[in-house]
Amino acid sequence: DIVMTQTPLSLSVSPGEPASISCRSSQSNLDYLNWYLQKAGQSPRLLPEQDSQRASGVPDRFSGSGSGTDFTLRIGRVEAEDAGIYYCMQRSFYPYTFGQGTRLEVRR
């Protein structure tokens, strides 16, 4: 199975600051990658794909980029509601596999 490795595993930022999460694949030819945000007590929510396409209702401060092995999710200006655990998921090859998650804390 393809291993997805996220960095960092946690980060703490103040509102208005940018944030960036990286995801690296153990296989080099990925075409499709999704990002998800899971908030406490909620199901994961789809965020931008690697080609910056956004799921409906995703704010434009979120952007995704990357190809091959290295992918990045960027948040232009973090807001309090962005706190939670972010996961990357490769959907190029079965079985689809997730990164271990990155916990984003938004300082008060």
From Swiss-Prot:
Protein name: Ig kappa chain V region GOM
Stretches the record annotates as Complementarity-determining-2: 50-56
Cystine crosslinks: 23-88
InterPro entries: Ig-like_dom (IPR007110), Ig-like_dom_sf (IPR036179), Ig-like_fold (IPR013783), Ig_sub (IPR003599), Ig_V-set (IPR013106), IgV_Light_Chain (IPR050150)
Location of the region described as Framework-4 in the Swiss-Prot/TrEMBL record: 98-107
A Pfam match: V-set
GO cellular component: a single term: immunoglobulin complex
Phylogenetic classification of the source organism: Eukaryota, Metazoa, Chordata, Craniata, Vertebrata
Note in the entry: Peptides were aligned by homology with human kappa chains.
Gene Ontology biological process terms in this record: adaptive immune response; immune response
